[in-house]
Amino acid sequence: MIKRILVIALAISTTLNAQNEVDALRYSTQDNLGTARYSAMGGAFGSLGGEFSALSLNPAGIGMYQFSEFTFTPSFNINSTKSYYNGTNTADYNTRLDISNLGLVFTIPKGDTDWKRINIAIGWNQLASYNRSIRIEGDNSGLTFTDNIVDATNGFTINDLSEGNAYSESVMAWNTYLIDPLFNGDSVVDGQYISNFSNGTKNQFKTINSRGSLNEFVFSVGGSFQEKLYLGATLGIPTLDYTEIANYTEKETSDTTSNLRQLDYSEEFTAYGHGYNLKLGAIYRVSETFKVGGAIHTPTVYTIEEDYYTDMITHFKDSTLDQSMGYEIPFQYNLTTPWKAIVSASTIFNKNILISADYEILDYTKGKLYPDYEFEYGNKAISKIYQKTENIKIGAEMNIKPFILRAGYAKLGSAFANKDFSRENFSYGLGINNGGYYFDIAYVLSQGANEHLLYNEEYIAPTSLVNTNHSLIFTIGFRY
């Protein structure tokens, strides 16, 4: 526990261990993907129903199922990230095959009563994918990662470093001779340090590879009252797994007299968690061609375990030194995500054109890490950095037998109070519905901007990132 607190306090690497509010945002944010039909229409299903992915949006839609159904959705994803650092543009990408959805719906007719059906469903939906690769490279003649370590180490005695009673990066830097004590003549100035790099320009290179996903097991129940009012509830049990591996290199480019030639610093962070939430929803059929809907999502309460491992290697002209530090005991904490509210409407034109729209609101400042005494800084940062935001989704569907054409758009608002890191989704799809079975395909283009700090923001400006995700989604379903 003490070592982790020291690592957090140092805040040298903002990717893995420095900002607990980053973890809170990651597990509170969801992608706008699901079955092929859901994805093709921008996820605007709050008043439509009859779609398994919508059980994680507005569970009232379960009341619209008139037949039992099985659905299965694989997807193929290509993610690319472009970085812009000190005049150098770099790109990286990864590909992945996912299972986005698997579910069963059972209809239970109630006969000649006002409650026409009571339906139940079980399955799971993928809510977010964490697969991403980032590559950052450029030359820096200013303050470097090593300078950051030197300044953070100043104030610790040599005895502190030798016994490991300092920030873990400082201890590793000492043990690998990345830093040395400052001398005043022949006397050591204890508590003051210098870098063994020269003062010249350094080439900096970093790769960040993350993988994992946020999935939700859903248990839903709902019904239809007089085919006018549809009510539903979903018990969600989300599970998350996240791994991030970051490798940073800093090396001399101009000074050939320096004995220290290169620093390699790597970090590996893993997180596993599970939680629970409740979603309640209603849809009302105003007329044969117009429906409205509303839903509310309680906060998800997560229990999360993390492991962190780091390694530092220094390369000299005639030797290489390696120092690693890991954490064998997992660090466990709790996270509560924000509430979410959704209002929706949909209408039909000319019997074959469907238009739908959703409006979502959630307040990222309401996320909270527990226990309080461990996360005072993180919770203050959540309140300061994040904001209340809105998501807008629009979808359309045209039935031109035997095909169904679809398109959608979603604007997912930025969680950050002072920076526009919103995302836009553009989607298209095609479906075939043969009564007893259906097959849908969708393409989704998702784009958004972000930033990454190579190390402490007092030493360096953020690197600009542009992330693009291409998703090809297939759904097959059977009714019985």
Report each predicted region and the residues it spans.
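Outer-membrane beta-barrel translocator/receptor signature
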Residues: A36, L48-L57, G63-N140, N215
